[in-house]
């Protein structure tokens, strides 16, 4: 039986800001821009009590919480803290699969400490994180990745929960499918149209039905409905793509305004790449219009991109190719694909460096 831990930092960006600035402690904080077209990147738990959430337009957030304090993001600091946390994980296991700067899967079945009880390992890791970074973490412990992820949400903030093989299937059956990890809003809505509201409803559907209506994801849904998830914790896992998108509160017609909206998307994409230690060669821009039609444009370079500015420059050039817009723009997206890990990127760059010398 595997022992999987999912560690998730509590309100990570906002908590770092409250840690570093005592005046922010106990107050509603949003990491992001207060500008009219700004977006909340993260919200403290004090802000969440007013309904403030990440990805929410700043105007909406300020309306819900008039005393909300906006703090500009410091991604270099968040990355440094994330590396401290990653080092703590490495004291316990080599099987670490980071999902972002603030969460990761750990397989502690065979761990470096020789500890047998996964809940004790999770508790010790959380204590170490608190001692070294001053931040709180929550954790979920189970026998597979899906249930560990679900468990980490049960006792947030600053808590942990375990889902055992005995209670796993029953837990899944009562869970609303919209809360399933891997089921986004569009998929949940599609499931609802088929009368699938809970895990029990999902379990009642055959593998053939799920494959027919949900494609490759059908087999995954069939398994997790039964508490089964065979995915391994993979330290070397490379995602096929990393993307970010934003739906605007007011549609855009102006190219300069639209181009300005690309920067936060490029920043988000690159910071996810840094967390995964990957880069990519193909930049894609998605433009969704007010009538819900969309256009995509891509550009592939010989070498992986190296930083926010390179993503932004490519995305801006691609966006310009669909201007004048045929309708006003309601959503923009930026995706980086053809991903490689850092070592592969260095190997590709080395021949050019040799030639230059």
From Swiss-Prot:
- GO cellular component labels: cytosol
What EC number(s) does this enzyme carry?
Answer: 2.7.7.7
The broad enzyme category this protein falls into is transferase
Required co-factors = Mg(2+)
GO BP terms, alphabetized: DNA-templated DNA replication; error-prone translesion synthesis; SOS response
Tell me the residue numbers annotated for binding Mg(2+): 8, 102
Pfam families assigned to the protein according to its UniProt record, in alphabetical order:
IMS, IMS_C, IMS_HHH_1
**UniProt remark on cofactor binding:** Binds 2 magnesium ions per subunit.
Catalytic function, reaction form: DNA(n) + a 2'-deoxyribonucleoside 5'-triphosphate = DNA(n+1) + diphosphate
Q: Output one GO MF annotation.
A: magnesium ion binding
Spell out the residues of the site Substrate discrimination. 13
* Compartment(s): Cytoplasm
Q: Where is the UmuC domain?
A: 4-184
Q: Which UniProt keywords apply?
A: Cytoplasm, DNA damage, DNA repair, DNA replication, DNA-binding, DNA-directed DNA polymerase, Magnesium, Metal-binding, Mutator protein, Nucleotidyltransferase, Plasmid, Transferase
Name the catalytic site residues: 103
What family is this?
Answer: Belongs to the DNA polymerase type-Y family.
Q: Per its UniProt record, what NCBIfam families does this chain match?
A: PRK02406.1 (NF002677)
Q: Which PANTHER family match?
A: DNA POLYMERASE KAPPA (PTHR11076:SF33), DNA REPAIR POLYMERASE UMUC / TRANSFERASE FAMILY MEMBER (PTHR11076)
Q: What does this protein do?
A: Poorly processive, error-prone DNA polymerase involved in untargeted mutagenesis. Copies undamaged DNA at stalled replication forks, which arise in vivo from mismatched or misaligned primer ends. These misaligned primers can be extended by PolIV. Exhibits no 3'-5' exonuclease (proofreading) activity. May be involved in translesional synthesis, in conjunction with the beta clamp from PolIII.
Subunit structure as annotated in this protein's UniProt entry: Monomer.
Q: What is this protein called?
A: DNA polymerase IV 2
Taxonomic lineage per UniProt?
Answer: Bacteria, Pseudomonadati, Pseudomonadota, Alphaproteobacteria, Hyphomicrobiales
Q: Which gene encodes it?
A: dinB2
């Amino acid at each position: 039986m595997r022992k999987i831990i999912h560690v998730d930092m509590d309100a990570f960006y906002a908590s770092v800001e409250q840690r570093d600035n005592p005046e922010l402690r106990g107050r509603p904080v949003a990491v992001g821009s207060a500008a009219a077209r700004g977006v909340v990147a993260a919200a403290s738990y004090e802000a969440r009590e007013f309904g403030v959430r990440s990805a929410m337009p700043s105007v909406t957030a300020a309306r819900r919480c008039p005393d909300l304090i906006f703090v500009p993001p410091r991604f270099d600091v968040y990355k440094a803290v994330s590396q401290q946390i990653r080092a703590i994980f490495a004291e316990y296991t080599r099987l670490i699969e980071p999902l972002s700067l603030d969460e990761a899967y750990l397989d502690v079945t065979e761990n470096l400490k020789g500890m047998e009880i996964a809940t004790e390992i999770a508790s010790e890791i959380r204590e170490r994180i608190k001692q070294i970074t001053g931040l709180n973490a929550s954790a979920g412990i189970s026998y597979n990745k899906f249930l560990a992820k679900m468990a980490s949400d049960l006792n947030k903030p600053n808590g942990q929960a375990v889902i055992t093989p005995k209670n796993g299937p029953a837990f899944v059956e009562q869970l609303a499918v919209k809360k399933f990890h891997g089921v986004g809003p569009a998929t949940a809505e599609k499931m609802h149209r088929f009368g699938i509201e809970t895990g029990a409803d999902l379990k009642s559907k055959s593998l053939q039905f799920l494959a027919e209506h949900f494609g490759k994801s059908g087999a995954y849904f069939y398994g997790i409905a039964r508490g089964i998830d065979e995915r391994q914790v993979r330290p070397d896992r490379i995602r096929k793509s990393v993307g970010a998108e934003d739906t605007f509160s007011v549609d855009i017609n102006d190219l300069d305004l639209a181009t300005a909206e690309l920067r936060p998307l490029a920043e988000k994409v690159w910071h996810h790449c840094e967390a995964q230690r990957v880069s990519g060669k193909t930049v894609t821009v998605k433009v969704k219009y007010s009538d819900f039609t969309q256009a995509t444009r891509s550009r592939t370079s010989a070498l992986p991109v190296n930083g926010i500015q390179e993503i932004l420059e490519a995305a801006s050039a691609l966006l310009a190719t669909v201007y004048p817009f045929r309708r006003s723009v309601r959503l923009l997206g930026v995706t980086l694909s053809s991903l490689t890990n850092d070592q592969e990127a260095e190997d590709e760059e080395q021949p050019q460096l040799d030639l230059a010398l």
